[in-house]
Amino acid sequence: PGVEKIEYNLEDTDGIPAKGGQPPVVNIFYSSRWVEKSEDSQGDDKVLYETRGVLYHELTHAYQLEPQGIGGYKPGTEFWVFIEGMADAVRYHNGFFPVDSRKPGGHWMDGYRTTGFFLEWLTGKDPDFLRKFNKSALEIVPWSFDKAMKHIFGEQVTTDSLWEEYQAFLKK
């Protein structure tokens, strides 16, 4: 996407960080109240670590593609899982989730960290996986996880078979 400007807004509100707008101008919102509470309980280093992680996540949203032909952003859908899983995969890939927070269980459709850790694990099978996965959102219509995995890894794989392999890896 043609992002020309990113506006970062630190606001005196409750709430979670979020990306707003569409290219060419994207906004990232962050709560100063959350920063204050976190600093009191965690100290400066942990707040800085978390803030950088949030920025990686939200900046990923600014640049990532959106799956075509499957509706829009709604929790529990493959569209939502793609969007939030990809953002957490990039965050983890860049060192802003501790590896010990990656646990067996859940489902690849859980989104956020669970999906993000799974997607990042797939970079061990193909170092260019995250880029290819993002690009698949334009190349496959209608898009689905299974179609994307087959597109990247070959017709013999399914998302479920890769998930089972990932779960076995986590249990080692």
Segments and roles (model prediction):
Residues 1-29, 33:
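Auxiliary, metal-adjacent structural segments of Zn-dependent hydrolase domains
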Residues 1-8, 70-78, 99-104, 129-136:
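Surface-exposed patches in mature extracellular/periplasmic domains of secreted proteins
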Residues 13-16, 34-37, 62, 69-70, ...:
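Solvent-exposed loop/turn segments at secondary-structure junctions
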Residues 20-38, 76-78, 98, 102:
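Lumenal/extracellular "mature" regions of secretory-pathway glycan-modifying transferases
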Residues 33-55, 69-79:
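Short pre-active-site segment immediately N-terminal to the catalytic Zn-binding motif
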Residues 53-66, 84-88:
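Active-site recognition of the HExxH zinc-binding catalytic motif
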Residues 74-116:
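Post-HExxH zinc-binding segment in Zn-dependent metallohydrolases
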Residues 115-118, 122-172:
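Pan-zinc metallopeptidase signature
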